[in-house]
Amino acid sequence: MNTERTLVLIKPDGVRRGLIGEIISRFERKGLKIKALKMLRLTREKAEEFYSVHRGKPFFVSLIEFMTSGPIIAMILEGDMAISVVRRMIGPTDGREAPPGTIRGDYSLSKSQNVVHASDSPESAMREIRVIFKDDEIIDW
């Protein structure tokens, strides 16, 4: 077994549309363990730090504006190959191309407002978790 941790964000559009419970339930039904969970509102500084890999890209400013437009849900999920499992569950970035049955395929109609974010590699997961969570917010059980 290859136990991994990954970070998932339910973005402001997912929170506004009341999709929190549905999205969390999908991950739980898959057998992923929630190690940390909180609602927060990203500051501009925290959003820029989180999405620093996209700094300088044409969509960076609008991404930061969107991610700071309302509350988000942040969670750490753990399980066997959690990063790739979660990425398959959420579907491609562009919700218009995501197949039905994926979170984005079922709930997203665009590339920019695509309901969820999930870490794409072990390195990204470690960095993103450190940006959003303090060590004492992560529960081992």
Curated annotation (Swiss-Prot):
Name of a matching Pfam family: NDK
Catalysed transformations (reactions): a 2'-deoxyribonucleoside 5'-diphosphate + ATP = a 2'-deoxyribonucleoside 5'-triphosphate + ADP; a ribonucleoside 5'-diphosphate + ATP = a ribonucleoside 5'-triphosphate + ADP
BP term (GO), one: UTP biosynthetic process
Family classification: Belongs to the NDK family.
Membrane-spanning residues: none
InterPro entries (UniProt xref): NDK-like_dom, NDK-like_dom_sf, Nucleoside_diP_kinase, Nucleoside_diP_kinase_AS
Molecular function via GO: ATP binding; metal ion binding; nucleoside diphosphate kinase activity
UniProt-recorded name of the protein: Nucleoside diphosphate kinase
